[in-house]
Amino acid sequence: MLFFDTFGTVVSWRTCVAEELNAAALDAVNHAHKDLPADLRDRAAAMTWDDWLAFVADWRQTYNGFTRSFDPSNEFVSVDQHHYNALQDLLRQRGLDGLFTDDKLWELAFAWHRLNPWPDSVQGLELLNRLFDTSTLSNGNVSLLQDLQRLGSLPFKHLVSAENFGAYKPSPLVYNGAAKKFGLEPSQCALVAAHLHDLKAAKSCGFQTIYVDREQEEEMSKEQAAMAKAEGWVDMWVDLESDGFREVARRFGI
């Protein structure tokens, strides 16, 4: 069975989220909230496209920190809730607190439900479905994955979220829970991901691993990635110049 990381592996997040933030800020400055303080209006108006891209990258980093540090013994906090909380913090840090209404903040937090698939994702999944059961294995909550599947026409046979196990990757509870959910041994499962740290954690649980390099997704340096490759974290390596999921299907003879 093939499990897929989702953010960055199946869908591209950077531009999609930046577009929503940029549009919302322009609307707030030019059309809504006519009573915005002048200094807030000026700071928002001064935000460039590159500024919003950097904002989104920082938002993504808060997600990484949140999921990696989450203690499964605590009450579960959804990714949606984290995105909302982190958005408020990031706006405050930039002097943009008060730019958006609470309803708008939640709408923007849900921008992560509206991400576009990479160009090879849909067709690649269709091909892989001929030979394998396919499922998400994402830290995104269930409703988020349902929206991504619906809006992106992603042909997964199953949707599995870390939410199902009250933990977040890289906790072993998620990988082991996913295998157990389908009555499989970990060795009967493979994780497809664009992040080597995710694959290392899956490999330590007994999963097979498939690395699909995506633009601007890998956090490790080239030297660290080469070391990970040499140490056997990855069973199938699809580089950036290849054709993503379609290349995975080709290597399986599909």
Locations of regions flagged by a protein language model:
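Intrinsically disordered, low-complexity domain-flanking/linker segments in eukaryotic proteins
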Residues: 26-48, 223-228
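Asp-based phosphoryl-transfer active-site loop
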Residues: 1-18
